[in-house]
Structure formats: structure tokens, C-alpha cells
Swiss-Prot record:
Locations listed in the record: Mitochondrion
Gene: RPL16
Annotated family: Belongs to the universal ribosomal protein uL16 family.
Keywords: Mitochondrion, Ribonucleoprotein, Ribosomal protein
Protein name: Large ribosomal subunit protein uL16m
Amino acid sequence: MYLTRKSIMLLRKYLLVTESQVSKCGFHIVKKKGDVLYPKRTKYSKGRCSRGCKPDGTKLGFGRYGTKSCRAGRLSYRAIEAARRATIGHSFRRAMSGQFRRNCKIWVRVLADLPITGKPAEVRMGRGKGNPTGWIARVSTGQIPFEMDGVSLANARQAARLAAHKPCSSTKFVQWS
């Protein structure tokens, strides 16, 4: 089967994170400081204000279970990584058999690719924009940031509940039907 460049871009649209695989189209991703994911380099180091984000990724695309955001907001790269680790930690700690460990897969469908800038405390106004301090991902209402497959419904619900406490936005559990 011949794949065009556009179809390859669509296939690599979402960030797929498992224990051994990291891929994202258009970015050079680096794992630094405790496996935190953000772009290695960008064309411009400081971001601009956008006009909003379209609700893309509102349906399950890879797994059978997922978490859906109930309101729009921002997710920091630390919150994304903490939620991913909470999900993986629950899955691997509570596993009763090795079959569960081999079959469990987790997809993170958001990437913190927007830089956040800030100025130091007690600095006067003016003199340009501040230095980049962190990375965020914009999440729209109904977007699915995390998906999982290869687990039972009860374990998936429990893992989604643990992961929901990490980001600052409210989420709900969804199931493919």
C-alpha cells in the first residue's frame, strides 16, 4: 500500500507514548528531567496569543477507554507526565498477572508544545517579554487527552480516576461502544 505524505502526517498526528515508543510529527521531542515530554527546539522560543483552539480529537482513536475533558483549559507538561505516570503506576502495581502487563497500552494524545513566559518578581514593567518558563498544551471541551487499551473495565476506570486528579481540569471516563 502506498502512503502519501499527507496520510503519513495524519497517521502521526497524535503523540503515542508507551514505555518504549515516542513519536510526534513536526517536533523533535526530548525526554528530560524525569521523562517529561516537550519540544526539543522550535522556530521561535516565545509563543503568541492564539484565537482559540478547535475541538479536535473528540472521539476515541486508538484505545477502548479514555478520559474526556469537560471544559477547556491548559495542561502543563508536568501535569501530563504526572497523569501518565499515575495511570501506568496503577496499571502495573495492581496487575494480578503478567498478561495484563504485556497487553496494557497507553496513548497520550496531547503534547505541551506552547511555551509560557514569565518575568522575575520585583521587575519593572516594560523591557520586552519574559523568558520561557515552561510548556503547556491547550485542551478544548470534549477532547480526549488519554486513551488506554488491553485492560479490564474496572482497572481502566480506576486508572482514569487516578489520572483525573493530576490535571487541573475536570474529566470524565469514556468507553468505546
